[in-house]
Swiss-Prot record:
It comes from Caenorhabditis elegans. This is Ubiquitin-conjugating enzyme E2 1. Keywords: ATP-binding, Nucleotide-binding, Transferase, Ubl conjugation pathway. Interacts with ubr-1 and rfp-1. Interacts with ubc-13. Gene3D superfamilies: Ubiquitin Conjugating Enzyme. The keyword Acyltransferase does not apply. Its EC number is 2.3.2.23. The keyword ATP-binding applies. GO terms for biological process: DNA repair; proteasome-mediated ubiquitin-dependent protein catabolic process; protein polyubiquitination; protein ubiquitination.
Length: 192
């Protein structure tokens, strides 16, 4: 059964595929359109430049009337990111609007990387260093940027980069299993 929430998420996914914002990528997991994986690339000319950061987005059937729960999966050192990866961002809380879509959420988080709000800290050490010792703050950010290179492509981030995922396949899992089986047979039978 397709609910309004699921239809909206299918539209959000289609929009992300057809008109992707610079530096962000996201897709539903293979078996659940309410669970997404995303990648945010660190904005250029910022301490986060060249970083590749994985996130998870958990939607409910109340989306778009209620925001998703968004967390960094990648390690993050930022004034507005809690130790568990949860993000302190007004549009994900008290300033949420149903007009926001997945692209807007991801680009807002990407902007937050460069423009933290140290007055509303989720990580007090990061906020303090950002305000009082920018050099040490940037050194710690560089460490997580380098760590993001080592961890990229492991486990959960792989589905995000698939360009061939069809919306119908996500909405109706298993619909294309026969195609997948044929592809697997062809791959295992080839002599390289």
């Amino acid at each position: 059964m397709t609910t309004p929430s699921r239809r909206r998420l299918m539209r959000d996914f289609k929009k992300l595929q057809e008109d992707p914002p610079a530096g962000v990528s996201g897709a539903p997991t293979e078996d659940n359109i309410l669970t997404w994986e995303a990648i945010i690339f660190g904005p250029q000319e910022t301490p986060f430049e060249d970083g590749t950061f994985k996130l998870s987005l958990e939607f409910t059937e109340e989306y778009p009337n209620k925001p998703p729960t968004v967390k960094f999966i990648s390690k993050m050192f930022h004034p507005n990111v809690y130790a568990d990866g949860s993000i302190c961002l007004d549009i994900l809380q008290n300033r949420w609007s149903p007009t926001y879509d997945v692209a807007a959420i991801l680009t807002s988080i990407q902007s937050l990387l460069d423009e933290p709000n140290p007055n509303s800290p989720a990580n007090s050490l990061a906020a303090q260093l950002y305000q009082e010792n920018r050099r040490e703050y940037e050194k710690r950010v560089q460490q997580i940027v380098e760590q993001s290179w080592l961890n990229f492509g492991e486990n959960e981030g792989d589905a995000v980069l698939k360009d061939d995922v069809e919306i119908e396949e996500i909405a109706a899992p298993g619909a294309n299993d026969a195609d997948d089986d044929r592809m697997d047979e062809g791959a295992s039978g080839s002599n390289a």
